[in-house]
Amino acid sequence: MTTRTKGRGHTAATTQNDRMPGPELSGWISEQLMTGRIPVSDIFCDIENNPGLCYASQMQQTKPNPKTRNSQTQTDPICNHSFEEVVQTLASLATVVQQQTIASESLEQRITSLENGLKPVYDMAKTISSLNRVCAEMVAKYDLLVMTTGRATATAAATEAYWAEHGQPPPGPSLYEESAIRGKIESRDETVPQSVREAFNNLNSTTSLTEENFGKPDISAKDLRNIMYDHLPGFGTAFHQLVQVICKLGKDSNSLDIIHAEFQASLAEGDSPQCALIQITKRVPIFQDAAPPVIHIRSRGDIPRACQKSLRPVPPSPKIDRGWVCVFQLQDGKTLGLKI
């Protein structure tokens, strides 16, 4: 910073840029000189003694370099804007942001209320899933009942009422009271169809055979196997294999009578033959925590076709009461478990 004395005794503080104008001002002066708008005499004048006569000096004072800032004025021409407009713009922006915030809070509240409203639907989904599973099981049991007993279209009381009114039993499968049919047959009622007589005789003979076997003190494994086979549908199923395992272990432990009694008791309670076999593995002590027997076979083709879909990888410690019937071991050492 240097200090120089101007004409008329005024002293002003100037910077290096004041004495050496920038290229912008020099270019502008050159353009004005070449076009003749500024006389040459105005340029080559006594700047020190007559600064007021110099056009360039006036232009330097009235049009300063935008890149420089005078020490007396702190206003930058680039920032020479209306601050009121900036304030108004910021205020409007703040208003918009506030409105968006309010809208977001309202949307969040609506989403929360919607979630609260959907909670009963979530709970209902569990109930529907449970009902679906139970209904599927019930339909499967009903189909099994229809296949094994025929579709009953009326109760025993309704059958008796129809028979008494029309003088003949209703068409199709129906439920009959054993004592009522016995009385009709013994009284030689001519309205009893031949098919009903044959069915009653077969039922009567089966009952007597069951009572005979049930009262037999020592039942053989072969007889017990045949009795269980007679109750099972199909052939070579996993339950047929389970019958063989039950009879084999029962014979080794002298528990055939207990197994037979348990089987008949389950049937008397209304259980299916398959369910009765499973109950034996869970109720008779010799099957609790018992490992399934290992059966050596040459190839997978030796396993009955009805058992193929029930084969599973063998777990570390299979148990009969957990549904593992037996373990098939192939010649190459690979094992397959039969699971029900």
From Swiss-Prot:
Chain intervals for the UniProt region annotation (Homooligomerization): 83-145
High-level lineage: Viruses, Riboviria, Orthornavirae, Negarnaviricota, Haploviricotina
Cross-link entry Glycyl lysine isopeptide (Lys-Gly) (interchain with G-Cter in ubiquitin), positions: 309
Impact upon substituting residue 322 to A: Complete loss of dsRNA binding activity
Impact when changing residue 239 to A: Complete loss of interaction with host PRKRA and subsequent immune response inhibition
Consequence of substituting residue 309 to A: Partial loss of IRF3 promoter inhibition. Complete loss of dsRNA-binding
PTM: Phosphorylated by host IKBKE. Phosphorylation contributes to efficient viral replication and transcription. Ubiquitinated by host TRIM6 to facilitate virus replication.
Region listing for Disordered, in residue ranges: 1-24, 33-48
This protein's name: Polymerase cofactor VP35
Gene Ontology biological process terms, A to Z: negative regulation of gene expression; negative regulation of miRNA-mediated gene silencing; positive regulation of protein sumoylation; symbiont-mediated suppression of host antigen processing and presentation of peptide antigen via MHC class II; symbiont-mediated suppression of host cytoplasmic pattern recognition receptor signaling pathway via inhibition of IKBKE activity; symbiont-mediated suppression of host cytoplasmic pattern recognition receptor signaling pathway via inhibition of IRF7 activity; symbiont-mediated suppression of host cytoplasmic pattern recognition receptor signaling pathway via inhibition of TBK1 activity; symbiont-mediated suppression of host defenses
Residue numbers of Phosphothreonine PTMs: 206-207, 210
GO cellular component, one term: viral nucleocapsid
Annotated phenotype, changing residue 12 to V: In strain: Isolate mouse-adapted
